[in-house]
Amino acid sequence: MANDNESATRGRRIFLKVAGGAAAALIGATRAHGLSANAKSATPGRGKAAESLDRSLWITWYDLPESGRDAYLAWLHKTYLPNLLRRPGYLWAAHYATRTSGGSAQIHHVDDPKVPTGFHYILIIGVTDALVFGNPIPSAIHASLPEEGRKMLALRTGERVNLMVEAGRCEGHASKAYKDGLTGAPCIQIGSFNCPVENEEEMHAGYIQQRLPAMCETASCVRTRKLNSVAGWAKHAILYEFASLEGFNRDYEAANSKSPLGTNGHSVVPMLVHAPNGPNSAIRIWPPVPKA
């Protein structure tokens, strides 16, 4: 009888061990399938699934001389940017020509000869996150270019660079119809600046509670991004993206005027110190904007 009990107990143990192993295998397979599905759904693309992937921007403001400008632009658009976008983590690039600069009379600018003053061209490169800019760093990428590429970059004057991370964004009414995915919109307004520490919370509240909603409620706004710096002179930046110049001209000032940058009707704009010649309105020259 004792042998029978012992045999039964041993049998139950074997059954439980086998059943437990099968259950663990099933759970493992299910988890692996889930991870695989999640990985596939996170693959970069041009649809809405990719909209959350470009969380860091490499922004360069600069000028160009007339001599050599056409050759530089051809090299930038046909060689430099396509090669850059083959690097891991690099998602899109947009090159802009500035239309206006300096902002309103209440805008204060930095008075420091060490801060470069270029503004006629603005190059924005979007990547997955700021870790991409750490290895290799942008200056190392430029140092490794062939001699022709280094000569082209040397044509830039007044070059100022900020590596920015996105603090947050709002999607505008024009985002659903926008066909260029993550790529910067055809018309932008961008400002980069510093703010006294004692005014930063109010400024942040002004953007979140007032300015971003006001811009994104307009018919032509694609998206608006509030940015903070990883490297560069400016600690803060704001990037408004519009589907067209016509829409920008119609909507930007109206939205700006009804959304004071502060709380309780107060504005911190007079406390901000902007980069030279900023903020800037600009139109995209690469990739070319399709004609309507």
PLM feature segments, named:
Residues 1-14:
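N-terminal secretory signal peptides
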Residues 4-6, 18, 39-41:
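N-terminal cationic leader/targeting segments used for protein routing and processing
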Residues 13-14, 18, 32:
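Hydrophobic alpha-helical segments, especially transmembrane helices
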Residues 24-29:
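Hydrophobic h-region of N-terminal signal peptides that target proteins for export
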